[in-house]
């Protein structure tokens, strides 16, 4: 995210979902489910279901609408070439995820396009009526997310 903001560019990766969430939601969901004696032995996917499971495209679209950012959508390899030789780039420590071919000449990140959606029935059922809700990623949540996770205050960054 920080690299995309610095470059004012987003790679064209389709339906890449990263399970974006908040610590508040995750901890509240885990604590609530763990207290239920019917939970042991069941699987709980805390990745959000449906439209709340934002793709990379959705996330940056929301940043543009909420804060006035403007991101160029560029082919993945062009985007990668913009930062791959800069060791100061936030993504540089995980360069291999973007560079090394894993299958069919594609790197790990490219392979995660068109990401599957996790089954969510147990989580939804166990959280029903609890008041524990996944984040909406509306403007106030996006602002907190940017400030707390990467130290960028959106009002200043978009200018």
Q: What annotation goes with each model-predicted range?
A:
Residues 25, 58, 122:
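Ca2+-coordinating acidic residues in Ca2+-binding motifs
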Residues 24-35, 61, 143, 147:
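Amphipathic alpha-helical segments that line or abut small-molecule/effector binding pockets
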Residues 17, 50-51, 110-111, 132-134:
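Short, contiguous acidic/charged loop-to-helix segments that flank catalytic cores in large enzymes
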Residues 33-106, 125, 152-159:
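Mid/C-terminal beta-alpha module of Rossmann-like enzyme folds, strongest
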Residues 1-25, 29-33, 45-47:
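A conserved pocket-lining segment of Rossmann-fold NAD(P)-dependent short-chain dehydrogenase/reductase
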């Amino acid at each position: 995210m920080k690299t995309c903001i610095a470059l004012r560019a987003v790679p064209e990766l389709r339906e890449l979902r990263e399970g974006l969430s908040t610590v508040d939601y995750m901890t509240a969901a885990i604590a609530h489910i763990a207290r239920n004696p019917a939970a042991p032995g069941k699987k709980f996917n805390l990745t959000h279901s449906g439209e709340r499971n934002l793709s990379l495209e959705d996330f940056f679209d929301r940043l543009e609408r909420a804060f006035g950012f403007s991101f160029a959508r560029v082919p993945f390899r062009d985007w990668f070439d913009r930062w791959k030789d800069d060791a100061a780039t936030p993504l540089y420590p995980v360069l291999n995820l973007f560079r090394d071919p894993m299958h069919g000449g594609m790197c790990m990140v490219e392979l995660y396009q068109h990401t599957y959606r996790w089954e969510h029935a147990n989580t939804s059922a166990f959280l029903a009526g609890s008041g524990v809700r996944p984040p909406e990623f509306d403007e106030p949540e996006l602002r907190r997310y940017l400030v707390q996770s990467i130290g960028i205050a959106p009002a200043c960054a978009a200018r």
